[in-house]
Structures are given as structure tokens and as C-alpha cells.
Amino acid sequence: MKEIDKKKEKKVEVLITTVDCKDFNGLLKKMNIQTNAMIGNQTSYNKIDSIDYNSLTIPVYSFNERGVGLNRNNLLMRSKADYCLFGNDDLIYVDGYENIVNKYFCKYPDADVIVFNLDEKRKTRFVTEKDFKVNFFNFMRFGAARIAIKRESILLNGISFNTCFGGGTKHNNGEDTLFLSSCLKQKLKIYAVSQTIAFLSDDRESTWFQG
């Protein structure tokens, strides 16, 4: 794949969703964050703050609310990046993920969404072995933690996460597929690629059903 001129690389931001986080710097380090990021922390209080991390200023939005879709929407509406990754707090990103995201949006210039692979010790998720275009017949196999979006395409088409579905709501899942379904209904272009973007860690108690 053709290398991208560093000066022409577009900005990638990781939108990190977590629940009751007490150590934000530790979270960023554990996730191997190398770019701009934002943290949405669903907890028992309301506070907007920022932390310094590896010469970056990372905004932290702590809100007394629940629902992973709501958490992602709160971050998405505040992002200014060209491309966004939806970062669950159990992900460990590969080195150079910003360059990887740029490479695949360069490879597929009409793409609005790129779906990457997630690596895990026990394979439970669909693994893309050869790049293909995502459509209404195959989109339900993918979750939000493995996708990168062209932020402007999502916002211009009025797409967001359904706040009635997903962790922390009455319906504990489904917000991922509803999001991708909305993208397809708006005729956005989605590609699944064989590149791994992150690893799933298994060293914490999941907060998925809390928020």
C-alpha cells in the first residue's frame, strides 16, 4: 500500500468510553493511545476537565448518566478530528494506528466508514481475511469498537447512536448494528479490511452492561 506523506495525514482521534474510571492517565497508557483522544466517563458526578498525557491535552467528560450510545454521542458531537475511532476501555491499540487509519481511507477514498479487525485470545468475533464492501447482507457482524469513521460524513448525514440500545440501557446491545444500518440507509460507503487495529484485553471486569 502506498505510503502517505506525513504532512498530508489527517487527524485521528480516539473517542474512549468508560464507566467510573479513577485513573485516566493509566487508562490511556493501557490502551496505548498515541494520538488525540477524548474520554467519556459515565459516573456519579458531572465534571468537564482535561489531563496532560504525552504532550497531548486530553478532554475528559464525566457525566452522571448511563448508556454507551449516549456516551459515544457526547464525544462525537465535540470532536474536531477528520477520522474517529470508537475506543472501548478494554482495547489496546496497535502501534502506528493513526497511520493505518490514514492508509485505508487513502486506499478507499470513497469510504465513509472502515471496519478493522480486533485481535483476541479466544476468537469470538468475525475476522475479515480479505477486504470487502459492507452491505445490508453482512453489516450485522461488526461492532463499533472496530470501526473508524470519516466524522464529517457522519455528522452531515445526521447519524448518531441510538440511545435506547447498548450497554447501560434496557436493551443491552444493538446500538452498533443500528449505527451501521443508519450509515447504509444514508448510502454511506463502508469497507471491511483485513488489518488489525487493536487487541482486546482480558485483565478487567467488564463494564459493558453498566454503560
Residue spans for each PLM region:
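Active-site acidic Asp-centered loop
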Residues: 42, 87-90
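Catalytic beta-strand/loop signature of glycosyltransferases that borders the donor
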Residues: 161-163, 187-199
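Acidic donor-binding loop at a coil-to-helix junction in glycosyltransferase catalytic cores
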Residues: 166-178
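Glycine-rich, basic loop-to-helix element that forms the pyrophosphate-binding segment
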Residues: 62-79
